Amino acid sequence: MTSADRRRDAVARIIRARRIGTQEELLAALERAGFRATQATLSRDLARLGARRVSGPEGAVYELGADGADGADGGLAALRGLVSSIAANASMVVIRTHPGSAPAIARAIDLAQPPEVLGTIAGDDTIFVAPAGELRPRRLAARLAELLGTPSALAGEGGDRTH
């Protein structure tokens, strides 16, 4: 087991054991457990674990997806309920998400490294996904819909063209 794997295991244990509302709290708890990490590293770990902040009566806290483990999908399975729609035009795919969810979903897509994806750009609730190579955006939209468990609403008649 690598040091990164041990650190992610510690992150998962901490999130399961108590209410963690911020990354600062989580970094402090990690340090008390003997792990040093930057905020950027912690963000990547949270994405790989499929962790997300959920609102409750006492404020937002982190929770893990069903299995809380790394997966080949980069944590996409844990984020499925946060996608509102997926659409494609002739050049790109647009994913609409619940407010604040786009960065985590884009990061999970990037971590999963699907060969069909050249890259992602995320705002607060919208993600632009550029298809790799000659892949048609409509096919990429269908693949992302499959990964995210979301029906795709394919837009535009020209969505199957590569240029």
Swiss-Prot record:
UniProtKB keywords: Amino-acid biosynthesis, Arginine biosynthesis, Cytoplasm, DNA-binding, Repressor, Transcription, Transcription regulation
Pathway, per record: Amino-acid biosynthesis; L-arginine biosynthesis [regulation]
One Gene Ontology term of the molecular function aspect: arginine binding
Any Gene Ontology CC annotation: cytoplasm
BP GO terms, sorted: L-arginine biosynthetic process; protein complex oligomerization; regulation of arginine biosynthetic process
Compartments, as annotated in UniProt: Cytoplasm
Coiled coil: none
Gene3D superfamilies on file: 3.30.1360.40, Winged helix-like DNA-binding domain superfamily/Winged helix DNA-binding domain
Keyword Transcription recorded: yes
InterPro entries: Arg_repress (IPR001669), Arg_repress_C (IPR020899), Arg_repress_C_sf (IPR036251), Arg_repress_DNA-bd (IPR020900), WH-like_DNA-bd_sf (IPR036388), WH_DNA-bd_sf (IPR036390)
Family: Belongs to the ArgR family.
Role description: Regulates arginine biosynthesis genes.
The name this protein goes by in its record: Arginine repressor
Source species of the chain: Anaeromyxobacter dehalogenans (strain 2CP-C)
Organism lineage string: Bacteria, Pseudomonadati, Myxococcota, Myxococcia, Myxococcales
Gene label: argR
